[in-house]
Amino acid sequence: MARFDFLTTPIAGLTLVQRLRLEDSRGFLSRFYCADEFEAAGVQQSIVQINHTLTRCKGTVRGMHFQLPPHAETKFVSCLHGEVYDVAVDLRKSSSTFLQWHGVLLSAENQCSFLIPEGFAHGFQALTDDCELIYLHTAAYQPAAEGAVNANDPRLAITWPLDIAEMSDRDRSHPLLAAEFEGFEP
């Protein structure tokens, strides 16, 4: 029995993953990840790092982060508590959707995860207080390979659902994309 539905999005490579939730009087069981099922769906990368975040304030935006090659990473993002609007921006140089973004709603209730391949910037906005996310990464964090773009970059024109209540100084200071930005190949 399949425990996941892999749903396509308007941007090639971005996938919304719906986890099957089995419930009874005791509660529920939801398979979070299965390498065999992901491989059968064409996702064949090993998880090497897992991060867990808490965002306390509704309206907070985190992002937009990525890692440059040769440390580019795929992220599998899930919400364990609360609700977030999760966004990925296509930075792949040769992509027909270069600089386009796609957002999805992730929550503990909807049992969805966002599979974001190499070559995308990632960020989110907390839609409730005390949001907890878990990220599965296919590459370890490498500070020298870290990249970011400003979540309010007018060239991206991301439509955040709420007014931005909080953003770290670091995220707020990420650069706007220069007109000559051509992306990169993961």
Regions found by a protein language model. Give the residues of each.
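Non-catalytic, conserved peripheral segments adjacent to functional cores
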Residues: 1-112, 130, 137, 142-186
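Short beta-strand His + acidic residue motifs that chelate non-heme Fe in jelly-roll/DSBH
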Residues: 114, 122-127
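Compact nucleic-acid interaction/catalytic patches
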Residues: 124, 133-134
